[in-house]
From Swiss-Prot:
Belongs to the grh/CP2 family. CP2 subfamily. Binds to DNA as a dimer. Interacts with UBP1 and PIAS1, and is probably part of a complex containing TFCP2, UBP1 and PIAS1. Component of the SSP (stage selector protein) complex, which appears to be a heteromer of TFCP2 and 2 copies of NFE4. This is Alpha-globin transcription factor CP2. The gene is Tfcp2. PROSITE patterns: GRH_CP2_DB. Residues 241-268, 294-326 are annotated as: Disordered. InterPro entries: CP2, SAM/pointed_sf, SAM_3, TF_CP2-like, TFCP2_SAM. It is found in: Nucleus. It comes from Mus musculus (Mouse).
């Protein structure tokens, strides 16, 4: 009886010893010189090796996702098995992302003949940087004024409809596309991974980013808010050609490893498949109406028209006439800041009305916005115009041009008065910036309300009445505020004229 009671205890001791010996024997497996060692026990603890988890697959494991996104860039060969793929990109280079429709026949029939909206983002991979994303992006915007983090290369893209880029969200672009048609989007990432490292002393590793795509379908109100699919991949961005060098270095390192060591790493694939993920949480502006600063044109446009520049908004007038008034409300002041390329400072001036902004002194705005943007904002607030490089004054002497026109059009004025001479001339100012003969021709044609092509040649009357052809060099040597009398005569061809400056 005593012998029977001692047997389980002996078995427990033996089993415990075997487990310890087995763990000890496994702890050395997988170690390699020059690299961080890992424990095989940890590997066996991964979900892929857990029989109890693999025997109960989730309901959606075999589900085919409605869409698939493929980034046409090779993955790094220096990524270990079971780790997420990593893809190297060059700064500013266009990379294709293929938008594929994986729906089975009869699946999601409500999308047939309909468009969907996809939102592209470049976000931080590290959770620590995700918490401070707003501050990080604001710092980047401060160091790179006027630049964007993410752009679409429209001329190279196929099937992209209504692309938009919000000037306040530098890392986001969106567009509509038809899943039943071929769609390829070429993106450009303009920030590099080392721009967000803690401190830059040279040789530091850059932080990884994520390219995330969220796709939505249209709801009953015509707004694209119903989530369909999200996927993302991990990237690192290098200076131009830096990604190619990094890929080559990783490949050469892998070639030096033994076959046994290579088994621990993933092969390099020619393309990167974005894997399913949760939708981006801060999708508060997803709707069908364009936000301030969006380009809402439904036709194709060049990358310059879609880069989020406030100059391409459909509604604002030219900045020259868009003056800020003391009666401007805080909401209107925010729109004025967006239109005049001061989106960076809208948060600072959230509660400022037009009167508040106009009361700021030059020193105030420089202290708030920094020297460069401060001076620009101060000039915009005061409505200051850029002084032209050259100003000349002209007056018409002959009325031949008026007589030759089939219909009366506004002419430079020649008014008669009751002085001793009986007449006096009224001059018109012409402002020149480029100081070229072509620019002078265009300005004179504008003055006479005719086409520049109707002015065959412009001459300047020289000594003894000779006619000298106006060249760029002659225009550049005009004196500031020089006065000229314009004489016109009919050219050899009909409906064109020679203009003589006297």
């Amino acid at each position: 009886m005593a012998w029977a009671l001692k047997l389980p205890l002996a078995d427990e001791v033996i089993e415990s010893g075997l487990v310890q010996d087995f763990d000890a024997s496994l702890s050395g497996i997988g170690q390699e010189l020059g690299a961080g060692a890992y424990s095989m026990s940890d590997v066996l603890a991964l979900p892929i090796f857990k029989q109890e988890e693999s025997s109960l697959p989730p309901d959606n494991e075999n589900e085919i996702l409605p869409f698939q996104y493929v980034l046409c860039a090779a993955t790094s060969p220096a990524v270990k098995l079971h780790d997420e793929t990593l893809t190297y990109l060059n700064q500013g280079q266009s990379y294709e992302i293929r938008m594929l429709d994986n729906r089975k026949l009869g699946e999601l029939p409500e999308l047939n003949g309909k468009l969907v909206k996809s939102i592209f983002r470049v976000v931080f991979h590290d959770r620590r940087l995700q918490y401070t994303e707003h501050q990080q992006l604001e710092g980047w915007r401060w160091n790179r004024p006027g630049d964007r983090i993410l752009d679409i290369d429209i001329p190279m893209s196929v099937g992209v409809i209504d692309p938009r880029a919000n000037p306040t969200q530098l890392n986001t672009v969106e567009f509509l596309w038809d899943p039943s048609k071929r769609t390829s989007v070429f993106i450009q990432v303009h920030c590099i991974s080392t721009e967000f490292t803690m401190r830059k002393h040279g040789g530091e590793k850059g932080v990884p980013f994520r390219v995330q795509i969220d796709t939505f379908k249209e709801n009953g109100n015509g707004e694209y808010t119903e989530h369909l699919h999200s996927a993302s991949c991990q990237i690192k961005v290098f200076k131009p050609k830096g990604a190619d060098r990094k890929q080559k270095i990783d490949r050469e390192k892998m070639e030096k490893r033994t076959p046994h060591e290579k088994e621990k790493y993933q092969p390099s694939y020619e393309t990167t498949i974005l894997t399913e993920c949760s939708p981006w949480p801060e999708i508060t502006y997803v709707n069908n109406s364009p936000s301030p600063g969006f380009n809402s044109s439904h036709s194709s446009f060049s990358l310059g028209e879609g880069n989020g520049s406030p100059n391409h908004q459909p509604e604002p007038p030219p900045p020259v006439t868009d003056n800020l008034l003391p009666t401007t409300t805080p909401q209107e002041a925010q729109q004025w800041l967006h239109r005049n390329r001061f989106s960076t400072f809208t948060r600072l001036f959230t509660n400022f009305s037009g009167a508040d902004l106009l009361k700021l002194t030059r020193d105030d705005v420089i202290q708030i916005c920094g020297p460069a943007d401060g001076i620009r904002l101060f000039n915009a607030l005061k409505g200051r115009m850029v002084r032209p490089r050259l100003t000349i004054y002209v007056c018409q002497e002959s009325l031949q041009l008026r007589e030759q026109q089939p219909q009366p059009q506004p002419q430079p004025q020649k008014q008669e008065d009751g002085d001793s001479n009986g007449t006096f001339f009224v001059y018109h100012a012409i402002y020149l910036e480029e100081l070229t003969a072509v620019e002078l021709t265009e300005k004179i044609a504008q003055l006479f309300s005719i086409s520049p092509h109707q002015i065959s040649q412009i001459y300047k009357q020289g000594p003894t009445g000779i006619h000298v052809v106006i060249s760029d060099e002659m225009v550049q040597n005009f004196q500031e505020e020089a006065c000229f009398i314009l004489d016109t005569m009919e050219a050899e061809t009909s409906d064109s004229y020679h203009v003589i400056l006297k």
